Amino acid sequence: MTFSLGQLALLGVGYLLSLFLAAYAVERNWLPRRWVRHPLIYVLSLGVYASAWAFYGSVGLANQYGYGFLAYYMGISGAFVMSPILLRPILQITRTYQLSSLADLLAFRYRTPWAGVTVSIIMLAVVVPMLTLQITAIGDTLHLLNNEWPVESLALAYCVIMIIFAILFGARHVSPREKHEGLVFAIAFESVLKLVAILVLGAVVMFSVFPQVGGLEQWLTTNQEQLAQQQVRLQDGPWRTLLLMFFAAAVAMPHMFHMAFTENTNPGALRQASWGFPLFLLIMSLSVPPILWAGYYLDVDTDPSYFALGIGLALESVPLTLLVFVGGLAAASGIIIVTTLSTAAMFLNHMVLPVYKPAPRYDFYRWLLWMRRSLIAVILLLAYGFYRIVGSDLDLSQLGILGFVACSQFLPGILGLLYWPQSNRRGFLAGLILGTLTWVYSLLLPFCELALGWEIPFYLPATDEGNWHLSAIVATGINFLLFVIISLSSRQTAAEAAAADACSIDTVSRPSRQPLVALNSNEIITALSAPLGRYVAEREVLQALEDLELPSYEDRPSALRRLRARLEANLSGLMGPTVSHDLVNRYLPFREGAELSEDIYQIEQRLEGYHTRLGGLASELDNLRRYHRQTLECLPMGVCSLAPDGEVLMWNQAMAELTGTAAADVTGSHMSRLPAPWGPMLLDFLQSQDMHRHKHRIDTGGRPHWFGLHKAVLQPSGGQPGGLVVLLEDQTETQVLEDELMHSERLASIGRLAAGVAHEIGNPITGIDCLAQSIRYETDNPELLEMADQIQEQTKRVSRIVQSLMNFSHAGHHSTEHDIVDVTYCINEAIQLLKLSKRSQDILFENDCPPELYTKGDAQRLVQVFVNLLGNARDASEPGDTIWVQGEREEQQIRIKVIDNGHGIDADTLDHIFEPFFTTKEVGKGTGLGLSLVYSIIEEHYGHISIDSPVASGRGTCVTVSLPQSEHTEVTETHS
């Protein structure tokens, strides 16, 4: 039974097109997102591991090693069962630092470009045999179904088709940041297809083939001797070596790394994969023994690796044969697409970009895209070249062994990355290189010699399919041994130690608190424009800011450090960790000479993420840290901790409530970024020699507040450079109570004085006034009448003085419930009252205050204030002078200035001008209580009054009144 090449080509291309349409439907959002991102899709996408070697070659493994073929499934299943301590930490590292391949991961950990180059070159030794295996399998199956064309030509045609589809599937995006969800869905689809194909074949064997001889059990009983001769006992074969190889494949094989880590969009899906993927492999392995036994029974004349296809041909079942062919095509195509994509990205990052980058004027993203496409074609053509030279003469098992043994050479470096922070680049590179050379000498060259019949004059060991595992053990053992010995005998660099902390699952990385040369995000864009071009630099910086949920402009030192780290991670996904690390270090350097210390805030943030994973003493210490942190957070007094350079490291809840600035907005920034009045107040205190300040007044929230400030110096210890702790205590209530107490005492004293004056003077004055009135009624003598008028005038004067004393004594006893007051209206009222006096007729009053000056207070008492101030200005002015009243709004206050051009006030007088009974007017023209009363009223309104004199040319006075500003625009009717 044969098929035409056209039929096979139509079937194969049709299948690949269906895969592409599935991927395209996902990218166009034709399918619900909950389907695409379901953990089951992720689990099935890991089925890319089941390549043509699993679909076809596992039957050959069963023929060689008996039940040892299960190592193919059990080795990698063991790695996924151990995912909490093996795969999950790697996933976290790759997601955090945007590492898209094993070369990226190892170059990041061992901090040398040679690590990336070496891993990339050796990965080629892994990839080429694995791709050759797929090409061989598809070429051989095509030849079995149609023997009219040479198998080499069929293999070449398959390679060309796969180059096209690999580019269509994965080389349409620039950065691995853009997940290929369509590719993941397509690989999940092909996993289902090959699982269905092999299960259907197994069912046909069980229920259609063996019933002819009484069932499978009867046939096995009859052919025990034949089966025993063709199988190897587990203890005699390479069982343990196979387990180790396939265990390492979970991380080291490029297609598994890509699907498990790079394309992972939901870290939680790895939990389902830890049991779901082993279950998938177990189900797939169930059909392998029946297929092998059916091949024996039907006497299929193909290699045991192709028994699956041979059974369909032997049964002359066209549907079964085509289903198996499509299943094998799915197995081979999936791994080819994913492997070439991941390997091309690896070579681009570590072999091309370190050597050549396009000029900034070119479209960097487009150049990356075409370079990746070219590398995909080169890798597949290299695999085809190896197939033409050697691969066609090696069976599937030999090709698979070559690839997986080479892959296991990465295992020491991976384990050191996770569990041995002291390992270093020298040990890693020495072990990897010598282990790989041992693989070449003891495995690759002997297999090539056997396949081609060459005589290679290098005294090669006699390696064959029976003892290859010894060479594999020697190569891996030498790798491990050198890795350990050289790492122990040499020291790490500082960069390696930092990377080791970032990668180790037993430690929390300790980021440093070091300022950048760039002062803001715009300067970072400018710095990166030199190597990347303006467009790419701006796009990458804005993307990093968006990832960190930061504003488009950022200048906080802590945020800039986070931005730098995020940029390095994002650029790592674009061009690899080596190039991105060098680029960031060169164009975004830290400031030289700055004192290096650990970033306590970032360390605490990371410890919070590790809290549930800590145990034992570490957990107890973390609980103690959290308790102390909570104590500081809940203190009723504001507490902030500062680094020596003024960067805020801690800002507790009370501090946030007092200042109105949240901890997230100020932590990591300099104190100078705090808004007024807090920034200037705290900076002035920090720069002073004072360790304590009591009752420091600031105006905020429309009223004055008083604060106590205290600071303490933190001495350097434990690698930390020290710093300052500042305590902020709200003393407003205490100050208000003290003011009220003093005010009450003063009023009581004045009240007693006024009462005494009224008692001692009031009654006699009343009597004198009565006597003067009696004189007016009892005489017509003009002289006596004039004398009586003078007596009454003087008694009225004394009465006014007594009334002033009484008014002063009652200052402060007015209601504290204030209304919204239009200050401009009060000034106009005061001016109108003054104009009623004859002394104001030749004085011009100019009110230049804006119409919306509002405060909370007593309108009548504020009118009294301005009557006093304007009256004093009038008394100091000459006829024809002008008195100006100016007003302005500030952040929290309104400011009113009363300016005259009078004779001014000398300095000695200014020092006593607000004291009671102090006056510069002539005797009989003032009591000295006016400005004292003004001062009391302004204090009642939480305001402030000051006098500057002279203003200019030795003349003039400016009285400034500051009152809390109110935002209300409706004014009460108290003005009337």
Predicted regions and their residues:
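Membrane-embedded helix-loop-helix hairpins and adjacent transmembrane boundary segments
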Residues: 1-559
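Conserved DHp (HisKA) dimerization/phosphotransfer helix of two-component histidine kinases, i.e.
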Residues: 697-703, 708-709, 785-813, 817-837
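Conserved micro-motifs of the catalytic ATP-binding
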Residues: 812-816, 854-857, 920
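Short helix N-cap motif at coil->helix boundaries in the Bergerat
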Residues: 823, 904-912, 926
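Conserved catalytic submotifs in the C-terminal HATPase_c
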Residues: 839-854
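Detector for a conserved hydrophobic position within an alpha-helical segment of the HATPase_c
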Residues: 938-939
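Conserved glycine-rich
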Residues: 943-950
